[in-house]
Every structure is written in structure tokens, then in C-alpha cells.
Regions:
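Acidic, Ser/Thr-rich low-complexity intrinsically disordered segments
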Residues: 229-272
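Structural motif
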Residues: 58-66
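Serine-esterase "nucleophile elbow" of acetyl-processing enzymes
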Residues: 1-53, 69-77, 250, 268-272
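Alpha-helical cap/lid subdomain in secreted, periplasmic
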Residues: 66-217, 261-270
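C-terminal/domain-terminus segments
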Residues: 208-236
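Gly/Ser/Thr-rich helix-start
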Residues: 14, 54-57, 87, 194
């Protein structure tokens, strides 16, 4: 239960948003962490964060597994609902940016508003993947644009985490940017990356809703050491499992597997 006078922010999303599990011994660079779990550090005590995001989910499976039902059950008028999907949707033909993906986003927005809540769309953070010529490899452009189009058509606020992340990678460079990700992973952040992205989300909320969100400084001087991956052993942190959501998360550790999955989804969609 949330006390009266406290606004709740509900988070709907995938592994880049979810509360990741802690590891012992704790090392900020070696553990998985997502911006959703770091967000409270940037907001004052009048805001509660309820993270319903889970690994491997899409705009479809988030609903199918009952997570949206939980949000709708507890959401009160004036509460906020941040919605970020895309990494896993783009691996399925029927959830591509010109198919059911925007339809699902609109449905979430409508449901939140019908309950008196305030929906906010968030574009997915970019992957730290680069082309052989040294330029950034943009893989989410279509889904990011779909989010922006839905935001315009439904008059919904949007926080462009994708733009923030890609600009950061290009400014910082691939090697240095790796320090913000779990070792061997180019999609899932560690504590450094979680705090970096949470700062963007908090700043966006403060800019759009200054009367509600008062952004704090968050962790100070929280940056990874150089060559972090060289300092850590990533071999014991490989994903496994056979469920779709586990397979999707495992793909993010292999650039080749990821690119193949995205290509197959595009081909399957074109053949339908």
C-alpha cells in the first residue's frame, strides 16, 4: 500500500527496465542492473516506483503473463505508467514496428488513461553495437520511430532514452561504453549503466512534469574504471534456458545471433 500524497510510477518493460537480482560479492560493474531499479535514487521521497518489468517480455507477453493486470489493479488516478518495449518485439514478425507493436502501445495508453493514470512512453536504449567501419550500428530505428509516432497520435509524453544512449555511445566510444554494460553483453547494463540511464528518465520526468517530479543528484562520480571488461571474468555470466524470453535475452550477448534473429523476423514478415 502507498500512503496518501505519494505518487506511484509504474514501470512496464523488459530486461532493460526490470529489477535485476543482486550478486555476491557485489561488484557494480559485474552485476546486471536496469534503469528501473536505479530510478528511485534520482527521485525524492514523495514518489514511489513499482517495477512490473520482466526479462524477455514484449508488448504482447507483458499482457499475457498478467503484469498489466497488476498495474491496472493498483494504479490510482494521478499515478504514472512508463512504458518501454522494443528489444524483444523486433525479434518477432507480428510485433515489428509496422505491425502489432504500435497497436499494443496504444492499448496500454488507453487503459492507463481510463483509470485516471498518466502514460509516458520511453524509447528503448540503444545497443552498444558498432559496424566494422567504426560507425554506430543502429538496430532499433523503426521501433523508436513507432514509439514517437504513437506519442504524437495519442498526445502522450515520450522520453527519448534511445537518443540519449546513442549520443552517449558516440561521444564515449565503443570500448569506454562497454564499462556501462554487463561483461560480454551489449544490451544489458550493469550498475553504472543503470544509473546513467535512470538519470535520463528522471530528468525527462522532471522536465515534463516539474510540479510532480523533483530530481535529486543521484550517485555522484559513478563511472566505471577503464577496461572494465578486462578486469572481470564474464564466462560465468552466460544466459541459459529454453523459454522464449530466456532465448531473447541470450541473443543480446551475441551480435551475430541478434542480427540473424532480426533479419529472420523481417523476412518472415515480408512473406506473410
Amino acid at each position: 500500500n502507498v500512503s496518501d500524497g505519494v505518487t506511484t510510477v509504474y514501470l512496464c518493460g523488459d530486461s532493460t527496465v526490470t529489477d535485476q537480482s543482486a550478486e555476491i560479492p557485489y561488484l557494480p560493474g559485474a552485476c546486471y542492473a536496469s534503469w528501473g531499479q536505479a530510478l528511485p535514487a534520482f527521485l525524492d521521497g514523495r514518489i514511489a516506483v513499482e517495477n512490473q518489468a520482466h526479462c524477455g517480455l514484449t508488448t504482447e507477453t507483458f499482457r499475457q503473463e498478467g503484469h498489466m493486470d497488476i498495474v491496472k489493479h493498483f494504479l490510482r488516478p494521478g499515478d504514472f505508467c512508463l512504458i518501454q518495449f522494443g528489444h524483444n518485439d523486433q525479434k518477432l514478425p507480428h510485433l515489428l514496428a509496422d505491425r502489432e507493436y504500435p497497436v499494443n502501445l496504444r492499448r496500454y495508453i488507453e487503459e492507463v488513461r481510463n483509470l485516471g493514470g498518466i502514460p509516458v512512453l520511453v524509447t528503448s536504449p540503444g545497443r552498444n553495437i558498432w559496424k566494422e567501419d567504426g560507425t554506430y550500428h543502429e538496430l532499433l530505428a523503426e521501433h523508436v520511430q513507432a514509439v514517437k509516432d504513437v506519442a504524437v497520435s495519442t498526445n502522450t509524453p515520450v522520453i527519448d532514452l534511445h537518443e540519449f544512449s546513442v549520443r552517449f555511445y558516440e561521444k564515449t566510444g565503443m570500448e569506454r561504453s562497454c564499462g556501462y554494460f554487463h561483461p560480454g553483453d551489449y544490451t544489458h547494463t550493469n550498475e553504472y549503466g543503470a544509473c546513467l540511464f535512470a538519470s535520463c528518465i528522471a530528468a525527462g520526468l522532471g522536465r515534463i512534469f516539474p510540479e510532480v517530479f523533483h530530481v535529486t543528484a543521484g550517485p555522484s562520480d559513478f563511472t566505471p574504471p577503464e577496461n572494465l571488461w578486462d578486469l572481470l571474468d564474464s564466462q560465468n555470466n552466460r544466459a541459459g534456458g529454453t523459454e522464449q524470453k530466456e532465448q531473447f535475452d541470450a541473443m543480446e550477448k551475441s551480435t551475430a545471433a541478434l542480427l540473424k534473429a532480426l533479419e529472420e523476423a523481417d523476412q518472415a514478415s515480408a512473406e506473410e
